Amino acid sequence: MKIITCYKCVPDEQDIAVNNADGSLDFSKADAKISQYDLNAIEAACQLKQQAVEAQVTALSVGGKALTNAKGRKDVLSRGPDELIVVIDDQFEQALPQQTASVLAAAAQKAGFDLILCGDGSSDLYAQQVGLLVGEILNIPAVNGVSKIISLTADTLTVERELEDETETLSIPLPAVVAVSTDINSPQIPSMKAILGAAKKPVQVWSAADIGFNAEAAWSEQQVAAPKQRERQRIVIEGDGEEQIAAFAENLRKVI
């Protein structure tokens, strides 16, 4: 059983600054970290490894220079995967969901898999598209919002999803792609033994050419900016007469 768990390196949000001039975001001082939602996918994959016979967990990521960081690689491997594959290329630095999914699908095909796990979204864009797009590209079943994995056999995965008024149980034929919600588990903090052992695990570094990927992105990101802050008008209306009520209503109309 070959399980791939996908993750994304994202900027640490506490270190992101906003440029006052145009509202653009400054990532220059933000260290990269594993997307919070993908930690649940990594944990779920490693829990499945304990259930499946001869299961192997491969962590897979696509991106730019952030994936060259040795500390980041060790962080991923210390959480339980047996090996790590990173696909690094400058064109993937700010890849949008469609391109990310295409690269992940190509890399997964080269690596081989029975099951692909990922988080419902990423901590930066949270587009909630990549998992389903990977399934579409590979032409295999894809399910998102999975809150519990009930069982795994050689050819079937049984899962639960929490819907608005009910709990849905699904049996999914393998191979498949599953995007898990944060309700599925609580990611463990790696032990010192796991951190030290991570340095001994294999890491494969692939380029776009290595996976036969040469498609250009269908669209590109133009700008990411923080919302403009409006100054408070500090209008105070005193009294409860008809004129004051009318003035209050008029000011409300201006801001609604």
Curated annotation (Swiss-Prot):
Entry keyword set: Electron transport, Transport
Function recorded in the entry: Required for anaerobic carnitine reduction. May bring reductant to CaiA.
GN (gene name): fixA
PANTHER family named among the record's database cross-references: ELECTRON TRANSFER FLAVOPROTEIN BETA-SUBUNIT, PROTEIN FIXA
InterPro entries to which the protein is assigned, alphabetical: ET-Flavoprotein_bsu_CS, ETF_a/b_N, ETF_b, ETF_beta_N, FixA, Rossmann-like_a/b/a_fold
Keyword Transcription: no
GO biological process entries: carnitine metabolic process
Oligomer status and interactors: Heterodimer of FixA and FixB.
Pathway the protein contributes to: Amine and polyamine metabolism; carnitine metabolism
UniProt cross-references to Pfam families, sorted A to Z: ETF
Identification of the protein by name: Protein FixA
GO molecular function, one term: electron transfer activity
Gene3D superfamilies (UniProt xref): HUPs
Family in the record: Belongs to the ETF beta-subunit/FixA family.
NCBIfam families xrefs: PRK03359.1
